[in-house]
């Protein structure tokens, strides 16, 4: 099977594996990127990618708050150029304000919320699409009511990552902000290990076992010793995706969970948005685009 050079390049960027290894992985996986990543990991040829989803869609994410509520949202555009357009940025801010003043609990409800202009969010998006010349869409949002505990938002400077955290008790604003910044940087999938689904654990253990098959030293160990080693490897992998088990980026001498425990607070909600998570953008070169229009 022929392998597209673009796929090899993309797989190398994700996994840091060698070119020929990436080619073999794609051949063995029928050119499926996700399956190729698993193949490389099973054969010990790639690092465990923190982010295996292909992130390609453009736009921005934003977290914003008022006295009663917090909202985090993602609005997509077709190009990065438009995502930096002042009209686009103003529209996203207008949508955030409208959602903050609503009780919308679903995307369908959110689209019907009216903005200060008198238009619904859906109508505003249609108008912006016509004015800007690209499809503009509200992809997702979450609206959270403030409680007696602490809450914090973090928006990265590039407008591509935002986080929203809610704690059960009061926490110093600087400490809360540092934890929110940690979540943005380290991208944990779960608050703690108890939240990790069995499917995820089983998939990771399968990969670890496949990797172990090629390790002669491991295979020579007694079965009970090997089992404990594999369990240890799984625990290490799970700690990478569990916030409370990650080393705190502000001070790596302790874990995030230990830090929060020392402050007598628990994290009850964690939301992290990154532009385009899970969306695969179709990339078309100029020649192909022109050819398609001539058909």
Curated annotation (Swiss-Prot):
> Per the annotation, which location comes first and is thus the protein's main one?
cytoplasm
| Localization per record | Cytoplasm
Q: Name one GO molecular function term.
A: translation elongation factor activity
Q: Which UniProt keywords apply?
A: Cytoplasm, Elongation factor, Protein biosynthesis
Q: Which InterPro entries does the record match to this protein? A: EF-Ts_dimer_sf, Transl_elong_EFTs/EF1B, Transl_elong_EFTs/EF1B_dimer, Transl_elong_Ts_CS, UBA-like_sf
Locate the region Involved in Mg(2+) ion dislocation from EF-Tu: 79-82
Residues annotated as transmembrane: none
What Gene Ontology cellular component terms go with this record?
Answer: cytoplasm
Functional summary from the UniProt entry: Associates with the EF-Tu.GDP complex and induces the exchange of GDP to GTP. It remains bound to the aminoacyl-tRNA.EF-Tu.GTP complex up to the GTP hydrolysis stage on the ribosome.
Q: Please state which protein family the record places this protein in.
A: Belongs to the EF-Ts family.
HAMAP family in the record: EF_Ts (MF_00050)
Q: What is this protein called?
A: Elongation factor Ts
Q: Which organism is it from?
A: Mycoplasma mycoides subsp. mycoides SC (strain CCUG 32753 / NCTC 10114 / PG1)
The gene designation is: tsf
């Amino acid at each position: 099977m022929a392998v597209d050079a673009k796929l090899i390049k993309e797989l190398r960027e994700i996994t840091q594996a060698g070119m020929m290894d990436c080619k073999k992985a794609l051949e063995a996986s029928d050119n499926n990127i996700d399956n190729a990543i698993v193949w490389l990991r099973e054969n010990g040829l790639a690092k465990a990618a923190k982010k295996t989803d292909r992130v390609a869609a453009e736009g921005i994410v934003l977290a914003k708050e008022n006295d009663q509520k917090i909202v985090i949202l993602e609005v997509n555009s077709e190009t990065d150029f438009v995502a930096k357009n002042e009209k686009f940025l103003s529209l996203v801010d207008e949508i955030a304000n409208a959602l903050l003043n609503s009780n919308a609990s679903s995307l369908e409800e959110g689209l019907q919320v009216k903005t200060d202009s008198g238009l619904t969010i859906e109508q505003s998006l249609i108008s912006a699409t016509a004015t800007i010349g690209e499809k503009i869409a509200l992809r997702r949002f979450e609206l959270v009511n403030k409680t007696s505990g602490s809450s914090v938002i973090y928006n990265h400077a590039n407008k591509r990552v935002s986080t929203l955290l809610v704690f059960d008790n009061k926490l110093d604003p600087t400490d809360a902000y540092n934890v929110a910044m940690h979540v943005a940087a380290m991208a944990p999938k779960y608050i703690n290990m108890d939240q990790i689904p069995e499917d995820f654990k089983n998939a990771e253990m399968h990969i670890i076992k496949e990797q172990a098959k090629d390790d002669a030293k491991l295979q020579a160990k007694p079965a009970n010793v090997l089992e404990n080693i594999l369990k240890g490897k799984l625990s290490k992998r799970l700690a990478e995706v569990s916030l409370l088990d990650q080393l705190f980026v502000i001070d790596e001498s302790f874990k995030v969970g230990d830090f929060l425990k020392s402050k007598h607070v628990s994290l009850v909600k964690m939301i992290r948005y990154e532009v385009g998570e899970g969306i695969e953008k179709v990339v078309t070169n100029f020649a192909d685009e022109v050819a398609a229009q001539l058909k």
